[in-house]
C-alpha cells in the first residue's frame, strides 16, 4: 500500500527512498555549499502575512492569466530536465497532469521527451518552451521553430547558465543519464547527452554545457531571438533591477525571477527577496514571475503579494512523478492549489486581483542591522 502523503515535504521524503541515489542527488542538489538552496525555502518565512478580516470569502477565484493565456491558478510547472529519470512517462505524465489541472507547463530543452511528444500527450495543455542558447545558433533556432509549430505559447530563455554551477553531488556521482535515456530534442549523441557521448569522468552535465552552450551570450542574443519568433519571450534568471530594466528595453514580454533552483551561483539572494526590486524596476511594463523555494500555498500568496504574476514549481513536480507518475504530479498541484485557496481565504482575498503588498511585511527580526 502506498503511504499517505499530505504535503510537499512528504513527497520529497518518499522520493528519496525510491529514486536511484545519483538521480535524487541530481534533482535535489544546489551549487557548492548550498546556502542559497536552503535560503530559497527559508526566506519565505521572513515575510509575514497580515490578513484582512470580514471580507466574505465564501467564494474564492484562483484563476488568472499568464502572458495572455488563462490558467486555473497562478501555480505553473517550471522547466525541469530529464524527467524520465523520475518516472518512465516523465514529461508526458507532467503535461497530462497540467492539462487536467488547467495550468501551464514549461518544457525543458533538456527533456527526455520531445517537443512533439509532449504536445501530442497534452494537446489542450498550455505549454511553453524553455530555451538554452547553443554555440550553434541553428540548434536553438530549430527548437524555437518546432515549439511554434507544435503550439507552444511562449519562449523562456535561460540566461544564467553560461557554464554549469558546481554541484558537488554530481561530481561525486559522476552524473550521466541512465543508458536507456537521452535528451530527445536532439539527434546527435553529443547534443542528446547520450551515454554514448564523451562527457568526462566528473559531472557529465557540466562537460555537456561546456561543450554545447554559448558562454558569450549577451543582450544582442535577446535581439536575435526577438527577430526569430513572434512568440512572447520571457527572460529566465534575472535577479537585479537594472538587468530587468535592460530586458524590458530589449522587448521581452516577461521576467522570471530565478536563481536556477540555487543550482548555479551559490550565495545569491533567495528569489522571494530579489522579487520586490525586479517588480519595482519594470514598473508594470512586463509580467514578472518567480520560481525557487515554493513549497506551500502561503509561499504562492506571498509571491503574488510582492508582485509576481504567477509562480513556477520544479522539484515538487519531480517528487510527484517519483511517487505515482501523472497522478503524483496532479496530487502535488492539487495540494498547492488547495493550500493557496485556504491561504487566500484566511487572508481575506476573494480573487487574485485583491492580493497586494499590504498583505506582507518583512519580519523586522530578519533584517540585518549591520
From Swiss-Prot:
The modification N6-succinyllysine is found at residue 184. Broad substrate specificity (S)-2-hydroxy-acid oxidase that preferentially oxidizes glycolate. The glyoxylate produced by the oxidation of glycolate can then be utilized by alanine-glyoxylate aminotransferase for the peroxisomal synthesis of glycine; this pathway appears to be an important step for the detoxification of glyoxylate which, if allowed to accumulate, may be metabolized to oxalate with formation of kidney stones. Can also catalyze the oxidation of glyoxylate, and long chain hydroxyacids such as 2-hydroxyhexadecanoate and 2-hydroxyoctanoate. GO terms for molecular function: (S)-2-hydroxy-acid oxidase activity; FMN binding; glyoxylate oxidase activity. The modification Phosphoserine is found at residues 194, 230. This is 2-Hydroxyacid oxidase 1. The lineage of its organism: Eukaryota, Metazoa, Chordata, Craniata, Vertebrata. Homotetramer. Belongs to the FMN-dependent alpha-hydroxy acid dehydrogenase family. It is an enzyme of class 1 (oxidoreductase). Its main location: other. Its EC number is 1.1.3.15, 1.2.3.5. It catalyses: a (2S)-2-hydroxycarboxylate + O2 = a 2-oxocarboxylate + H2O2; glycolate + O2 = glyoxylate + H2O2; glyoxylate + O2 + H2O = oxalate + H2O2 + H(+); 2-hydroxyhexadecanoate + O2 = 2-oxohexadecanoate + H2O2. The gene is Hao1.
